[in-house]
Regions:
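A residue-level signal for beta-strand positions that form part of recognition/binding surfaces
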Residues: 1, 88, 190
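A short, flexible beta-alpha/helix-coil linker loop
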Residues: 7-11, 117-121, 154-156
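A broad, structure-centric signal for solvent-exposed, well-ordered loop/edge residues
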Residues: 9-11, 107, 200
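A short, structure-level motif marking secondary-structure boundaries and short turns
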Residues: 13-14, 59, 152-153
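The AdoMet/dcAdoMet-binding core of the Class I SAM-like
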Residues: 19-150, 159-167, 174, 186
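Substrate-binding/catalytic lobe of Class I Rossmann-like enzymes that use SAM or dcSAM, i.e.
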Residues: 153-155, 159-201
Length: 201
């Protein structure tokens, strides 16, 4: 189990690292429903690497870039949670928005957002990763049929519902289609933005 300032970030079963994680991380595989021939994905936020392990296991030929702000998190993920860098997975120590702004070399078929900061009051989305300008940067770095999946901690009607609604409305200013998928085992909702105008389900 990995905690930041008392907030649980990652959990897994040592006997089977593909089990025991939060359900919402499985939802990060949904972008491939829209883009089943995806070749390159970007994950913002590493934590204990639940998303990275799943992608490397189920989609071994997909190239994955992970952006993590804190080098200490990357060190712990490698040493204690079995996260590996190899020919299909590269970890970049960088701010997520800065990475998108500097990226001129590649387009991604999917971007998965799970980048949180934390303090004594809990976890929160960094403001600069939740603006219209950020989503425009992300859309520019997506392929024509690219998809953005964003983990938002909150619920529909009660706890942090205002954050969920605000994120949904902001994504809709950039992405023609936005869907929401609540996790059953936690207060997480994954918002999925589809870049293509014909990207409906």
């Amino acid at each position: 189990m990995l905690r930041f300032n008392g907030s649980m970030e990652t959990r897994l079963l040592i006997a089977n690292p593909l089990l025991g994680h939060f359900e919402y991380t499985d939802y990060f595989q949904m972008p491939l429903l829209w883009n089943p021939k995806a070749k390159r994905v970007l994950v913002m936020g590493l934590g204990g690497g639940s998303t990275q392990r799943a992608f490397q296991h189920y989609f071994p030929t997909v190239h994955m870039d992970t952006v993590e702000l804190d080098p200490a998190v990357a060190k712990v993920a490698k040493e204690w949670f079995g996260v590996k860098e190899n020919k299909t997975h590269k970890i970049h120590i960088s701010d997520g928005r800065g990475y998108l702004r500097r990226n001129k070399e590649r387009k991604y078929d999917a971007i998965m957002m799970d980048a949180y900061s934390s303090n004594t009051y809990g976890s929160f989305i960094p403001y600069h990763l939740a603006t219209k300008e950020f989503f425009q940067l992300a859309a520019e770095d997506l392929t024509v049929n690219g998809v953005l999946a964003y983990n938002v901690i909150g619920t529909y009607n009660e706890w942090r519902a205002d954050i969920v609604g605000s994120m949904y409305r902001t994504m809709k200013t950039v992405f023609p289609h936005v869907y929401h998928f609540p996790a059953a085992d936690s207060r997480n909702i994954v918002l999925v933005g589809v870049k293509a105008k014909t990207g409906g389900l």
